[in-house]
Every structure is written in structure tokens, then in C-alpha cells.
Amino acid sequence: GLWAEVTVPYVDIQLESGGSTAWFKSRLEDGGLPPRLYYGQVFWVDQIKKDEYGQTYYRVNPNYYGGLDTLWAPAEAFRPIHPDELEPINPEVEDKRIVVDLIHQTMSCYEGNSEVFFTRISSGAKFDINGNPVDNWSTPVGTHQVTRKYISLQMGGGTTGAGWDLPGIGWTSIFVTGGVAIHSTFWHNNFGVWMSHGCVNATPEDAKWVFLWAEPFVSYDPGAEDISISGKSSTIVEVVEG
């Protein structure tokens, strides 16, 4: 198999079996719109086929171990991710830390006292879609560490009717129990504004850079790492308010 990322604005997908997950059903129920994948999503491809017209299709999975749905999408919409792309950034540096500033909605990466990376992010939202204040979406303030990393992950939460379920979230670095993570974001481009349900939203490019720079480092296959199992060292994540 191989990892591949969507490189077009969107691509319609075909369902071979399943269709039971919330993200798929909600798309069908939303005016009968076709299920789609979007730019920046990352999937594990484990089969390739051609149709009667000679067009190549990938079978895409929400993560390395597959999922409840069996999906096919035109291969031309994807760029295969080569194993060389997962080479760690500055692996020889031991003193690394990530600082997420909730007030300014920024993220910085430090090697010692030197800032080597800076970007805008979107952390936990302060208001819901109706403008009502919310507290349970706040990104947890404090000193944490990256505990699990995934090249791609299907993430979900919330309650029935008001929940969310999204596959193919790339370059995910979890740093708080419960799934709070730095990860790629394909559903908005409003960075610098509080938008998430607690995670640190970043562009696909920024999330990938942090993923490759921060420990623990991840191998191509299976594309995941858990320090509770491997015992590997990990990078500190400081979430501050100003």
C-alpha cells in the first residue's frame, strides 16, 4: 500500500460497501450531494483498479487499518506520498518545544531558545455557530507532550445531531488525553481565529512540517506512533494565553 494526499479542490468518491459512518451518511442526507474528498486529506491506498474506460481508481481508507466504508476515488486526484517525505526534520536536535499561543492564535517551534518555525493556527472556539459562548471547546492550557502521531486519522466527537466525523485528517500529533491534537485542516482557511473543538488546526503544509519536526518520529508503514507502547522520547507542547 501507499499513502496519498488529495491535490485537487475536491473529488467525488464511490462507495463499494459500508456507508455507515456519520460523515458519509450526513453527506448523502444533505440534499443528496455526492460524497467527496477535499484538498489536503490523506488516505491509505491498498488497492488499485481500472474501469472499462481505462481510468485508474484507488481504494482509499481513512487510516492504515482500513475503516467501516470501502471507498474508491480517481487516482488522478491524488499525489502518492513517497517514504522519503517522512524523513525527520533536524532529528539530531534534542531540545525542541512547541508553543501554542491561544490569545494571538499562533504556533511557534523552538530549538533551544531559537524560534525555527512560526505560523497562525485556529484553536478551540469560544462561541458556537449560533454565537453562544462555550467553554468545553477550549484548548487545554498547560505543558503537555506529543504522545501519539498519525499520518492520517479519522476524527470525531460531539453528540448525535451536533457531532462531527471527519476522515483523512493528515499529520496528526496528539498531545492531550482525549484526542486534542495539532493536525491538518481542510474544511476552513480561517487561521488566526478560534475555530476548533479543542484541537490546534493548521494548514496541511504547516501540520506536516510540525509532524516531521516533532518527536516521536513516525515510520511510513504503518504511519503511526504511540510513546506508551514504543517508549520513544517526545516533544513538549506548551499551550499559553499570551
What role is predicted for each listed range?
Residues G1, L37-P80:
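SH3/SH3-like beta-barrel superfamily modules
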Residues K49, P62-Y64, H104, E111-N113, ...:
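A mature extracytoplasmic/lumenal domain signature
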Residues G1-E5, P74, F118-I129, P133-D135:
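A short beta-strand/turn structural motif
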Residues Y53-Q55, V100-Q105, P167-I169, K232-S233:
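A short, compositionally biased
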Residues P91-V93, F117, D128-I129, V134-V141, ...:
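Exported/periplasmic cell-wall-interacting domains
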Residues P9-Q55:
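Beta-loop motif signature
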Residues V6-S17, F78-E92:
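Intrinsically disordered, low-complexity Ser/Thr-rich linker and spacer segments
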Residues I81-F127:
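A structural motif detector for short, solvent-exposed N-terminal "entry" segments of globular domains
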